[in-house]
Regions:
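Single transmembrane alpha-helix segments in multi-pass membrane proteins
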Residues: 13-62, 70, 75, 79-96, ...
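Transmembrane helix-bundle core of multi-pass membrane transporters
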Residues: 106-171, 272-277, 304
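Inter-helical junctions in multi-pass inner-membrane proteins, predominant
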Residues: 13-17, 169, 206-239, 271-279
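Short, non-helical or kinked segments that cap or interrupt transmembrane helices
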Residues: 34-52, 89-102, 177, 222-235, ...
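Pore- or pathway-lining transmembrane helices of multi-pass membrane proteins that form conduits
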Residues: 86, 90-115, 123-129, 158, ...
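Cytosolic-side transmembrane-helix boundaries in multi-pass membrane proteins
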Residues: 165, 173, 183-197, 266-304
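Hydrophobic alpha-helical transmembrane segments
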Residues: 15-18, 47, 51, 67-75, ...
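Helix-loop-helix "hairpin" substructures at the membrane interface of multi-pass membrane proteins
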Residues: 146-225, 248-249, 253
């Protein structure tokens, strides 16, 4: 049985699913990274992603174009990011309370709108009736075991965005100003730059990436929208940012690790009860944080 499980896990399909799954978390992680650089930790990623997922699939369904859906998701995400920035930066609200509120409000709002559209009274799923899903660009790798092996174009696009974020943060003045707005706001003011403006840029940028992540989740990875479909991926993205030390490349690698665990869990459902395999991604995230904690404890002991 052990050999069968290993054969099921280490297949080309698993690794393609790894990239597809990691993309959702990596995009949200890039958004969280921007707010973290600005001295804020936005834990409302799940809510922004959920609103982006809903806006993306509904916008595409109404227009018949996946491009319109992506733009709708990005716009909604940026608006929510701006709202988060106003509440935290201007009104000095607690960032964690606002993040939790965003998550709760997004679940309630999208559930209400979904049930209003399809008339359901209980938990439901929205399946687009237009053919825009088939027009979303994919990279086709053939068929294996009767299953098509596809990699969505958003996967390589995400890698490009990771490289751009790496360059932006460590090689441009704006990246240094963004970091200074969180660590040394007074020093930033002394050179004539507004730390508040840089924080707003980080918050709106977070909304951009989370909206894009939500659009990919509902229009590409799942090709449908269901209530609470983010399944705490936003919190996993936060864990990836912490594990990756706010470095875009390391955050992407952490997301790939989550993606592999998620893809492997899907392959193991034929051998292990699904209720158990569903916990694997979260157990993997906890293990990542445990390893990081042990490494930090060891460094402190050496420093002492």
């Amino acid at each position: 049985m052990q050999d069968n499980i290993l054969q099921a896990i280490f297949t080309p399909g698993t690794f393609l699913n790894m990239f597809n799954s990691a993309t959702v978390v990596a995009l949200a992680g890039l958004g969280c990274l921007l707010t973290d650089q600005a001295g804020m930790m936005n834990i409302g990623l799940d809510g922004i992603m959920l609103c982006g997922a809903f806006a993306g699939v509904i916008g595409s369904w109404l227009s018949g174009s996946w491009i319109v859906g992506v733009l709708c998701a990005i716009c909604i995400g940026m608006l929510i990011g701006l709202f988060y920035g106003v509440m935290v930066i201007r009104w000095k609200s607690d960032e964690f309370i606002i993040g939790v509120a965003l998550n709760l409000f997004a679940v309630a709002l999208t559930t209400f709108l979904l049930r209003s559209i399809d008339g359901a009274q209980s938990a439901g799923t929205f399946h687009p009736t237009t053919g825009f899903i088939d027009t979303i660009p994919k990279i086709h790798f053939g068929v294996l075991g009767g299953t098509e092996l596809n990699l969505y174009l958003m996967v390589p696009v995400t890698f490009v965005l990771v490289i751009l974020c790496q360059f932006f943060i460590y090689r441009t003045p704006y990246g240094f100003w963004l970091h200074a707005s969180g660590e040394h706001p007074d020093s930033l003011r002394s050179v004539g730059r507004s730390p508040e403006m840089m924080k707003y840029i980080g918050s709106i940028g977070c909304g951009f990436f989370c909206g894009l992540s939500g659009a990919y989740l509902s229009m590409g990875y799942s090709s449908t929208f269901s209530e609470g479909m983010t399944n705490s991926r936003g919190f996993i993205a936060v864990a990836c940012v912490i594990f990756g030390r706010s470095n875009p490349l390391l955050v992407f690698l952490a997301a790939l690790l989550f993606g592999f665990i998620d893809a492997a869990a899907l392959r193991m459902q034929g051998f292990v009860d699904r209720t158990l395999t569903d916990t694997f991604p979260y157990l993997g995230t906890l293990l990542m944080m445990l390893v990081l904690a042990l490494v930090q404890i060891r460094k402190r002991k050496r420093a002492a």
